[in-house]
Amino acid sequence: MLKRKKLLQGFLKFLPLIIPATIFVSCARRESNHLIFNISLDHDADASISKFFELYSNNLSKKLDKKVTVSFNIIDDSFTKISNIQTAKADFAFVNSQSIKDNGIEEFNLILQTQTDAFKEDTNLDYYSDGQLKSKAEKMTTLFSKTPYKDWEDTAQQWTGSRYNFLYETNKLINFYRGMILITGSEEEIKKIKEAWDQKKWSDFMNYGIGHGSSGSAGKFQLPDLLLRKHFGSSYPGLQNAINQNPDKFANVRGREIGRDNKIKIVFDDANSFAWTHNDKNATNHFYTPTENNGKGDSEKSNNKNNKVEILTYTDPMLYDIGIVSDTLSDRYQKAIAEVFVELAKTKQDIYGPSYGYNGYNLITDPNKEILDVIHKTYG
């Protein structure tokens, strides 16, 4: 009995050392040999993306000093990607900043900010409160309309196969995008639309007819809606309410089709969408070009051929896609996953990113300052 008592006392003596070790093991985050990434993929991307992730796996293995393979699933919806991260069906994903705003920043391990090439005249993260959005738009309008869009040529306007390079800054990356408000009409009509805007007369502005995208679109609905709330104040009921109250003043219209419907003089679109929209010189009705017959036949001909298209203003910025990682992975895994993307981009080995508009990456070191502050300034 005495011997058993001494053994028990000895066990109890070392119990405080055993318990923390047990807890540490049970809470240790994993360092898996196989990782699953959820990515979006452009329809023009090909099998080279698989080769990229082979290269990515090799670089990640070297950084972690162990064999790690990365496989990917193609998923476009950010909310599905987030769900997969939260339920351990995926280890890493690029998601849009709207989904992070809707779910709450505290829910995520934000490790990577994607970047894209900057447009001319818009290289800084300016907001409506700074008073620069309209002047930026005016400068881009000058560049856009120097040669009418219908006359743009591959050589003169530097078409690369995916965009017109003359609209972009050289070697300048930014981490945001915007929406824009396009307007069309005769010089007199455009003057009056601008007056309604400058005088903050919502009803007058709306009566010119507004084209918009789906309610889930950032550039074609959400960002313009946020801007209108700030600009028109209490006289503006919100975009969806305005549509419900005055359905005859609104229509679902693509920005590139502006000028085809005489009842719609204002259209919301992704900022500078003409930059990646190729001009077909043989087209009957050119994009971003008011048509003489509105595309509806001779019975509705109008004097549109002298009408213009301008950018009235840009919207506040929305952050470009953000890389999130599962919190079940160890810190060194999380750091390595982000660093490999950055390194491959800097050495021009990133095949995946540019295929989807990611031209660079930044490591996120302060999520509150780098992400949350921007979201708050845009959403108010």
From Swiss-Prot:
Membrane topology: Lipid-anchor
InterPro entries assigned to the protein according to its UniProt record, in alphabetical order: CypI, CypI_dom_I, CypI_dom_II
Chain segments annotated as coiled-coil in the UniProt record: none
Residue positions of covalent lipid attachment, annotated as S-diacylglycerol cysteine: C27
Organism superkingdom: Bacteria
Keywords: Cell membrane, Lipoprotein, Membrane, Palmitate, Signal, Transport
Signal peptide per UniProt: 1-26
Keyword Iron in record: no
Principal location listed in the UniProt entry: membrane
Region entry Disordered, spans: 285-304
Function noted in UniProt: P37 is part of a high-affinity transport system.
Identification of the protein by name: High affinity transport system protein p37
Species name: Mycoplasma pneumoniae (strain ATCC 29342 / M129 / Subtype 1)
UniProt gene name: p37
